[in-house]
């Protein structure tokens, strides 16, 4: 797990909320505090659909327009937390050249990204959850490095905190 302090908040938020750089991820949870608190869970409500959806998880690209609409205006949110889970496609994109991609495919841990904005500071935090206990940290270290490299490839200034 690493924490990346983002120095270019506006640019980072554009990549998160406007561009498609994280669209392949699944939403775990989002909380935004403006004049009132908005909370969004990443589980799909099957009763809302006429036909059962193929996936019970919600992709970030489905939720971000709602979040963006909620926060746009003259005032920035007091607080915002967005937790994403990497999809298989996103994990492949970031880990395919890491040397641990085959191990990732065997173990299939949950790879997480959390974006936290509070008190005019934005941080990205990586995370990983294994189905079984392991002392092997290779996937975790590769995920941390891949996320840091990905953020830098987007042209966003970040430093480990």
Model features per residue range: what roles?
Residues 1-62:
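Charge-rich, low-complexity N-terminal segments
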Residues 30, 34, 39, 43, ...:
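Short, surface-exposed, charged/polar-biased interaction segments
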